[in-house]
Amino acid sequence: GYTQGDETNDPYEPLQHIPGLAVGGWYDAGDFDIQANSVLNTTQDLAYIWTTFRPERDQTLIDQKTKFADIHVPDGVPDVVELVQHGTLNINAQVENIGFVAQVIGQPQMHNYHHLGDALTLSDGLLYDPSLKPYEVSEDGLRSGTPDDRFVFTGRMSAAGIMQDIVSLAAAYPALKEYYPEESERSLKN
């Protein structure tokens, strides 16, 4: 499990919504947590694979804007480069919104850990509002009383942890430069 003390190490209050984090990254095998070490190390390893071997395989269409992926549909970008981008989208979002990569973006309750099926169905996609009754949706349709938003555990803040953030983004910079120059520069900047 994870613990979070009173200090969040970021500009947000405990349980306050942190915008911009629902992008990129990978879930752990067996649950739907997004762990820092998994995302950082996977992104770094994929970047090194690209810069060392340049595998040109392109069998997956990935559209980050619409969050759509389709296998066996080439899109002109090598799959490994798209995977590097998928990692940096998550890393950069955390660095820009929190200041560093959190220990984990995890499930809010034990019920979610035995969930089977598509991760999309873990949440209603609305911001949690404790003033609403469970499953009640606000009139504007943007908030609900369902406490299904992920928790961001930001107690990981350390010099050693931030070094891994830097190393992963630095490794991604040359891998992304040709196909995703904006994300490449964003990684270098962060």
What kind of feature is each model-predicted range?
Residues 2-40, 53-189:
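Extended ligand-binding groove/face enriched in aromatic
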Residues 43-46:
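HEAT-repeat alpha-solenoid elements in large eukaryotic scaffold proteins
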